Structures are given as C-alpha cells and as structure tokens.
From Swiss-Prot:
Name the UniProt record assigns to this protein: BTB and MATH domain-containing protein 38
Annotated source species: Caenorhabditis elegans
Family matches, as Pfam families: BTB (PF00651), MATH (PF00917)
Domain spans labelled MATH: 79-204
SUPFAM superfamilies per UniProt: POZ domain, TRAF domain-like
Gene3D superfamilies registered for this protein in UniProt: Apoptosis, Tumor Necrosis Factor Receptor Associated Protein 2, Chain A, Potassium Channel Kv1.1, Chain A
Domain of life: Eukaryota
Length: 387
C-alpha cells in the first residue's frame, strides 16, 4: 500500500489552510507553540513592608527551591481506550462517532465514515479519525499523544487491523486520522463484520499537555508516606489521610487529633456510624481535587458536613442546591430547615410566585416536618402575593 494511504491526515484539510492564512495575515504565531513567553505583569506587587528583625534560626543554610526546574513542562502520561460499534455497517453513509471521553483532562472522540474522494484516488475507503478538544475556541492548549486505531477481527485466524500515529493536537490540529484506513471491500466482509456490526477502537496515550491543568487525584486506600500521617478505619477498611489537612476544615477533627482526646496520641482512629464510600466521597470534596456536589451525593454530604462541622462542604452543598432544578422545592426547604441554610431558604421563597405554589408544597407529605419558622415564612409569602 502506498505511503499516501498510510499517512494520517486531517478530516477536513481546508480548515487548517484557512487557519494558517488568518494567522499569517496577522503576523502572529499560535501561543501553544511557544508556551515559555511570559507576559509582563499588569499590576505591581503589594508594597514592601518594613523588614522584621533578623533571627538566626538556621534558615540561612537552607537551599532555595528550584522553581525554574520544577516549572519545566512535565510529562503526564495518561492512557485511555475509546470503542465505536457501528451497526448496519453495509449501509454506512454518514459519519458516526462515540460520546466524548476524557483522557489527560481533555475530551476525545472516535469517529468513522466512508470516503471516496480525490485523496483516496476515487476509491471507496473506510475512514477513521480522532477528535481532541474540538469544541474549544482557545488557541492556548496543546497535547502530544500517540493514537492507535484497531479494526476488531471476527476471525480468530486474522489479527486486528491497526494503524498508529503521533501528533501534537491543538486548536489548529484537533482532528486527525486515516481517510484511507482500509478499502471498503476489505472491511465489508465476514472477517470484520458480524451481524452487520463493525467495531473500531482507539487507544490514546497522552504524553504531554500544555494549557490544561490536571485535576489532582487521590487514592485514600494507598499509604503515601510523605503526606499521610493518620489512618481512619471504617468498617475494617483503612483510609490514609493527613490529620492537619482535615483539621483545617473541621473543628471536630481538630479536637480529635490535637486536643486532649484519647485519639490525639493515636495514628489510627476508628470512625463509627459512617458509610465508607460516603466518607470517601467527602474526602474527595474537601481535598484539592474538590469533587463537585451532585444530586447523587448532596444528601449524605450535608449529613457528613454537619456531623464533622465542615463549613466548606455545607457552603458548597447550599450553593449547589440554590442552582439545582433537579431537587424538589419541598426537599430544599426541608434541608434548609434541618441544616439552617438561610440562603437556600431565601432562594426557595423567592422562587414562589403564586399562591398555588405554596398550596402544592402544603400538600406534600414532607410539609408536616417543616419547622414552625419555615411554615410562618411560607404564610408571610402568601400574604405578600395576595396583597
């Protein structure tokens, strides 16, 4: 097979030429090609305060941290697999693709179609492509990655057909693949088609990403010597944490780890009346990854945030509930009541526009569990609407 058919290309090469013409006309280069250009600061640093009296505490012998070396682009090798199953393959006419899947903190999508154009010598081919962050309008990111496409074989005597390429994906090069991946007549047979279904996979190995930050990930089930100094035991399962970090968020943990409680001298503490996976979710919310609050976890995070007096968790839950349309108003009012969430209660009351809205709340089973203060607030809202 000629080199023409084995070299990866953009799905729409005209897009790249148009982009280059615009950049050439403006006499600028893509910022992601030279990430080391550091702009001047817009604002001055805070005024220098008077120097404190120098105290010799041995710090003079400490070597400064080499930020320049640390800030060199670091490799963040991440792998992922995308799988595209194409039904009714013999009648494939238009482009089909997978949902987006995040690999290396960037969205990737595998796509396939047929092509019979000048670049395929007017021969019908099965084409496959990979999209990386195609919906972003930013020109500040780039991603070095290796992509391997595989056409799954249905015949045990025939290995999968594969092709691989390496590319720097960026705004100007976010779609790449093989327009001549395999001749149509070579694909459309029993070696690769079963029950009118063809399966294509793409293995993506991300080697380096610029302009997009990786979200920190933590495995609380693994002991990390430098940052873990406390073991929490829940239902005989161990979670390894940093007690000072937890104490910053929770006065309950501060008292447990640093006051005159018997746990102070321990390196392992058992927590009772806690569900392991729910507490693990709590840790993911308060650790630097700051996992978002969702409809699935908000209820038990409110319980745990209240139990351990973690104001950050309570605030995040309240912020989520104020903006959520998936949680019923009566449920929001009940939680606002239970955990004294004034902003949430205020939001619920402001969303009541008609007397019928209050009547609907009153007809619910949960209404009887509301406090007298909340019932009075609902009555006052009715009076405001009527008057």
């Amino acid at each position: 097979m000629s080199e023409q058919y084995t070299t990866p290309e953009r799905e729409n090469p005209d897009d790249e030429r148009a982009f280059d013409r615009v950049f050439d006309a403006l006499s600028i280069s893509c910022p992601c090609d030279n990430p080391s250009n550091i702009p001047n600061r817009l604002f001055a640093s805070p005024p220098t305060q008077s120097a404190p009296e120098q105290i010799d505490n041995g710090a003079a012998d400490v070597q400064p941290f080499d930020f320049q070396a640390y800030n060199q682009p670091r490799l963040a090798r991440t792998e992922g697999m995308l799988k595209l199953e194409i039904p009714n393959f013999s009648n494939l006419r238009s482009k089909v693709s997978t949902p987006f899947q995040y690999i290396g903190n960037l969205p990737w999508r595998l796509a396939a179609k047929t092509e019979k154009t000048k670049r395929t010598s007017d021969v019908k081919f099965f084409s496959v492509y990979i999209d990386c962050n195609p919906e972003s309008e930013s020109t500040l990111w780039s991603c070095d990655a290796v992509v391997e496409f595989r056409l799954v074989s249905r015949n045990r005597t025939i290995p999968p057909f594969s092709r691989q390429f390496t590319n720097k994906f960026n705004y100007n090069s976010n779609n790449w693949g093989f327009p001549s991946f395999m001749a149509w007549e070579d694909v459309n047979n029993s070696n690769y088609v079963r029950n009118e279904m063809v399966t294509v996979t793409a293995r993506v190995v991300v080697q380096k990403v610029l302009g997009v930050r990786n979200v920190p990930k933590y495995d609380f089930g693994a002991m990390q010597t430098n940052i873990c100094d406390m073991t929490l035991v829940i239902n005989k399962q161990k979670l390894f944490v940093n007690k000072a970090y937890l104490a910053l968020y929770s006065p309950v943990f501060y008292a447990m780890f640093f006051s005159n409680f018997q746990e102070r001298e321990k390196t392992q503490v058992e927590l009772e009346d806690v569900v392991l996976e729910e507490f693990r979710e709590l840790l993911h919310v308060i650790y630097p990854c700051h996992k978002p609050i969702t409809s699935d976890n908000v209820e038990y995070l409110l319980e745990l945030g209240d139990k351990y007096e973690i104001q950050y968790v309570m605030d995040e839950c309240e912020r989520f509930l104020v903006g959520s349309e998936d949680i019923l108003q009566i449920t929001k009012l009940m939680w606002a009541d239970q955990y004294l969430l004034a902003k949430l209660q205020d939001s619920c009351l402001r969303n009541i526009k008609e007397v019928s809205d209050v009547k609907a709340i009153k007809l619910t089973e949960e209404f009887k569990n509301l406090s007298d203060a909340t019932k009075a607030a609902l009555l006052e809202k009715v009076l405001k609407i009527v008057n």
